[in-house]
Amino acid sequence: MNLLDPFMKMTDEQEKGLSGAPSPTMSEDSAGSPCPSGSGSDTENTRPQENTFPKGEPDLKKESEEDKFPVCIREAVSQVLKGYDWTLVPMPVRVNGSSKNKPHVKRPMNAFMVWAQAARRKLADQYPHLHNAELSKTLGKLWRLLNESEKRPFVEEAERLRVQHKKDHPDYKYQPRRRKSVKNGQAEAEEATEQTHISPNAIFKALQADSPHSSSGMSEVHSPGEHSGQSQGPPTPPTTPKTDVQPGKADLKREGRPLPEGGRQPPIDFRDVDIGELSSDVISNIETFDVNEFDQYLPPNGHPGVPATHGQVTYTGSYGISSTAATPASAGHVWMSKQQAPPPPPQQPPQAPPAPQAPPQPQAAPPQQPAAPPQQPQAHTLTTLSSEPGQSQRTHIKTEQLSPSHYSEQQQHSPQQIAYSPFNLPHYSPSYPPITRSQYDYTDHQNSSSYYSHAAGQGTGLYSTFTYMNPAQRPMYTPIADTSGVPSIPQTHSPQHWEQPVYTQLTRP
């Protein structure tokens, strides 16, 4: 049994002073953790150590008895920690429990603790600057990396310790002691974590509280970031803040952002796609697009993102309207106010032509017909339309915005564009929004007219009809009679063809 002598000594020392081990974690483990490594005493039912240790080891063990660990353990540790000097300092015996009336009986070490105790001493000697916590982390990682053969010596030693412990303390019951110091630290850490968790929620709530003012309830539902961002813009649901959009960037943002933020229907490609990117072929083919299909993809609110754009560009205005539709009055009014001032007089004349279109528009969306009458001064129309989410605005929008040329012209003439926006806004603010975007995209292709080809040919005329464009074009507005887009709708409404589907969708909201 000379083989076991070192083990016995080690066990006694561990029982007396495991707490004195260099690392508090070790003492904690030994006293408190049944089986940190998962290979605890329960799983180590075999006691093969006596047989497994080579016969020649006793001599080595005797030599290293001062190390308090059998050679097999030391060899295993040194294998894992290759290159370390294997001079284990004698285990400091801190008589924690012995001083008390009843000396505290520590639980037998499990395999991991056996490994950690031996390896920690070695590492601590070699790297005295290492913090115990770092040592423990490293030891745990190394232990997980060990294979069964490498763990066997520790497992066997742990089993031996368990059996010995049972002999020494037959009545032993595990009664974990409260570690006040540890508990306090843990409690503090827990509190800190709780605080960290709470603070985000509080922030989120605060954001939500603010968000209702800036954005609709939907935006509130979205992440706090959106709320804060939207506070800048109209109340439209999850649309991009108006302030964010710059005239140049408005197209991309409207098209791209509205879907993610406000577009509940991410499927809409047009929002994400800059029509400018589309080839003229694609645009020309777009004519064949069913407006209703487009509407499907447009959010019922219109493009929430639209509000983001200010009346910067006509199509922007239209978008604004759509977003106005979403946020109907506030965004729409803002757009209107901006756009109305310059264009109202010119728009009024064009509005007369739109009125004719309005009747055809009813085909698209009867609810929106009323909007056509609002065509009065754009300012009025815009405001009215904005307030009349979708119906009137959509109607007008169809009439005016459908033609890509209109957009391109608007792009060319920013002031006129503003006028267009208001005009479109009144008609479409809610209803137009989906189309506005598409148109907007098309606008990006000023060749979008091909996209609207029916509207495009008419578009120029259409916009011409609108004072927004050149007066010459205004007359053409009536000619907009391109029915290619909307055969059912009068030629004038060819742009409306787009709008009609929009009406359906806009009306839905």
UniProtKB/Swiss-Prot annotation:
Crosslink position(s): Glycyl lysine isopeptide (Lys-Gly) (interchain with G-Cter in ubiquitin): K398
Effect upon mutating F112L: In CMD1; loss of DNA binding
Signal peptide positions (record): none
Feature: compositional bias, Basic and acidic residues: 56-67, 160-174
Residue positions of motif 9aaTAD 2: 290-298
Domain of life: Eukaryota
Name of the protein this chain belongs to: Transcription factor SOX-9
Disease: Campomelic dysplasia: A rare, often lethal, osteochondrodysplasia characterized by congenital bowing and angulation of long bones. Other skeletal defects include unusually small scapula, deformed pelvis and spine, and a missing pair of ribs. Craniofacial and ear defects are common. Most patients die soon after birth due to respiratory distress which has been attributed to hypoplasia of the tracheobronchial cartilage and small thoracic cage. Up to two-thirds of affected XY individuals have genital defects or may develop as phenotypic females. 46,XX sex reversal 2: A condition in which male gonads develop in a genetic female (female to male sex reversal).
Biased composition (Pro residues): 341-376
Name of the coding gene: SOX9
Gene Ontology MF term list: beta-catenin binding; bHLH transcription factor binding; chromatin binding; cis-regulatory region sequence-specific DNA binding; DNA-binding transcription activator activity, RNA polymerase II-specific; DNA-binding transcription factor activity; DNA-binding transcription factor activity, RNA polymerase II-specific; pre-mRNA intronic binding
Record note on what altering F294L does: Does not affect ability to activate transcription in vitro
Outcome, altering F154L: In CMD1; 5% of wild-type DNA binding activity; transcriptional activation is only reduced to 26% of wild-type activity
Free-text comment about domains: The transactivation domains TAM and TAC (for transactivation domain in the middle and at the C-terminus, respectively) are required to contact transcriptional coactivators and basal transcriptional machinery components and thereby induce gene transactivation.
Result, substituting V282D: Impaired ability to activate transcription in vitro
Biological role: Transcription factor that plays a key role in chondrocytes differentiation and skeletal development. Specifically binds the 5'-ACAAAG-3' DNA motif present in enhancers and super-enhancers and promotes expression of genes important for chondrogenesis, including cartilage matrix protein-coding genes COL2A1, COL4A2, COL9A1, COL11A2 and ACAN, SOX5 and SOX6. Also binds to some promoter regions. Plays a central role in successive steps of chondrocyte differentiation.
Cellular localisation: Nucleus
Region (PQA): 63-103
Oligomeric and partner information: Homodimer; homodimerization is required for activity. Interacts (via C-terminus) with ZNF219; forming a complex that binds to the COL2A1 promoter and activates COL2A1 expression. Interacts with DDRGK1. Interacts with EP300/p300. Interacts with beta-catenin (CTNNB1); inhibiting CTNNB1 activity by competing with the binding sites of TCF/LEF within CTNNB1.
DNA-binding region of this protein: 105-173
